[in-house]
């Protein structure tokens, strides 16, 4: 933690460092330079619990306590950043298994697909959080290699990058379980959650979102976020680097939530 800006540390943060009651990670660097993040230990558990309030299925299931698997880039996945090839045991952090160990899913060979399928069946995650592109490649290769893989989790979330309608339809044709979109970032947490009715809602607990018109468009916006969720590193007017397609709306969703903006996608 020597590289963390000492002048920004409050006494509360210094005490957390002394007691090792903190966790540190880096952003993946997909939209900007990698940033070091410091937050209270097990911060994501509370984040899952907050997010579940925007989807009745997740609320009933208490997914923050579920065993979870993550399939996304191997460079950096939330709490895990690997420079070498880690073992199965080394990729289990708390109740989460990180599945991918290669930088490019297009280079996955049959042995890679067999390993991923075997580890999922061995770990038995109730919830799988995936990059939709990675999952679609995995499903294609399972079919191409004729691998017998029957495991079905209780829920799948699609995050990390934009999921097109065709990819969503393809995934749903192969996996029969509740599937929903999530949008967020390592530094902020979850910002948008798809409800059980298929509508994206702002997860507005301790967070405020501002949409700035993008290149004079009336339907495209730059996403600016202010978040107080992480007491060690609050973000004010943070430029996410992502673009939102949205229209004004004050309609009440069938799930009971009312979102002032109809957000169609984020990328």
Give residue ranges: language-model regions:
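Short, acidic Gly/Pro/Ser/Thr-rich loop/turn segments
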Residues: 34, 76-78, 230-233
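Short linear functional motifs in flexible/disordered or boundary regions
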Residues: 39-40, 63, 80, 140, ...
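Short, solvent-exposed polar/charged micro-motifs at secondary-structure junctions
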Residues: 2, 79, 190-192
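Short hydrophobic/aromatic-rich motifs at helix boundaries and adjacent loops
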Residues: 23-25, 86-89, 139-140, 259
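Conserved AMP-binding loop of ANL adenylate-forming enzymes
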Residues: 56-94, 103
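Active-site glycine/GP-rich loop and adjacent strand/helix microenvironment
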Residues: 95-267
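Short secondary-structure boundary/capping segments
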Residues: 42, 85-86, 198
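Nucleotide 5′-phosphate-binding alpha/beta core
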Residues: 1-26, 31-67, 74, 122-129, ...
């Amino acid at each position: 933690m020597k590289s963390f800006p000492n002048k920004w540390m409050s006494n509360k943060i210094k005490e957390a460092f002394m007691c090792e009651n903190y966790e540190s990670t880096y952003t993946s660097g997909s939209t900007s330079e990698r940033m070091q993040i410091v937050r209270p230990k097990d911060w994501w558990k509370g984040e899952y619990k907050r997010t579940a309030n925007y989807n009745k299925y997740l609320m009933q299931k208490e997914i923050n306590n579920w065993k979870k698997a993550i399939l996304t880039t191997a460079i950096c996945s939330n709490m895990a950043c690997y420079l070498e090839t880690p073992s199965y045991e080394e990729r289990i952090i708390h109740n989460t298994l990180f599945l991918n160990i290669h930088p490019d899913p297009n280079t996955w060979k049959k042995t890679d697909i067999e390993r991923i399928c075997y580890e999922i069946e061995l770990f038995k995650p109730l919830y799988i959080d995936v990059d939709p592109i990675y999952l679609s490649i995995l499903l294609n290769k399972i079919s191409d290699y004729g691998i017998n893989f029957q495991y079905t989790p209780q829920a799948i979330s699609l995050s990390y990058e934009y999921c097109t309608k065709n990819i969503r339809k393809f995934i749903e044709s192969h996996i029969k379980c509740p599937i929903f979109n999530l949008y967020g970032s390592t530094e902020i947490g979850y910002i948008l959650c798809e409800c059980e009715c298929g509508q994206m809602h702002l997860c507005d607990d301790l967070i405020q979102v501002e949409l700035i018109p993008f290149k004079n468009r009336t339907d495209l916006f730059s996403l600016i976020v202010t978040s107080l969720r992480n007491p060690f590193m609050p973000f004010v007017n943070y430029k996410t680097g992502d673009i939102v397609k949205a229209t004004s709306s004050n309609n009440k969703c069938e799930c009971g939530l009312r979102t002032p903006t109809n957000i169609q996608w984020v990328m």
